[in-house]
Regions:
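ATP-binding/phosphotransfer module of carbohydrate and carboxylate kinases, centering on a glycine-rich
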Residues: 6-14, 28-44, 55-163
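General beta-strand structural signal in soluble alpha/beta enzymes
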Residues: 16-21
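Active-site-adjacent loop/helix segments that line or gate small-molecule/cofactor pockets in enzymes
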Residues: 22-26
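Extracytoplasmic strand-loop-helix segments at the start of, or within, the mature domains
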Residues: 51
């Protein structure tokens, strides 16, 4: 594999930091959004064509968790529960919420998080599916919506520059 961060650093001759889009969104929601000032383990998911994830423990990112690839009922979770699958399979909000319930219950069992934050484009319609979920962990919609990725990337870059 190629270390893209190192390659860019060498080419540009400047400090470079990198992270994936879900990790960037997670950092933004913890620093400035729905999970601001919430202690403990925060799991931010981005529901889109797949399922992105960010795990932040007491403000520290655990990078590249890729929780959309967990196996649920013999399937890759995002192949059953992503927002893209809801559209592709023409699932009602109720049927899709059942799939989300299996996914979030599994993640909850593995991590015992203090908060779930749900992002991605479909989070704008959170009232259609979040109330249908029955979890021990509070689950809330993202606040930063489509700006979360760029806000999180800028935040990470500023933190890297300061250190």
């Amino acid at each position: 594999g190629v270390n893209l961060t190192e390659l860019m650093r060498e080419h540009l001759g400047r400090p470079v930091t990198g992270l994936n889009d879900a990790d960037a969104a997670g950092l933004a929601e913890v620093a400035f959004g729905a999970a601001k000032d919430v202690p403990g383990t925060i799991i931010v998911t981005t529901l889109g064509t797949g399922i992105g994830s960010a795990v932040i423990v007491d403000g520290t990112l655990v990078p590249n968790t890729e929780l959309g690839h967990l196996e649920i009922d013999g399937y890759d979770a995002e192949s059953r529960a992503s927002a893209g699958q809801r559209t592709a399979q023409d699932l009602s909000w109720k049927k899709w919420a059942k799939r989300l319930q299996r996914y979030y219950s599994h993640v909850e069992m593995l991590f015992s998080p203090d908060l779930f934050v749900v992002g991605g484009g479909v989070s704008r319609k959170h009232e259609k599916y979040l109330p249908l979920l029955d979890l021990k962990t509070p689950i809330v919609p993202a606040q930063l919506l489509n700006t979360a990725g760029i806000v999180g990337a800028a935040y990470q870059a500023s933190r890297a520059r300061a250190s």
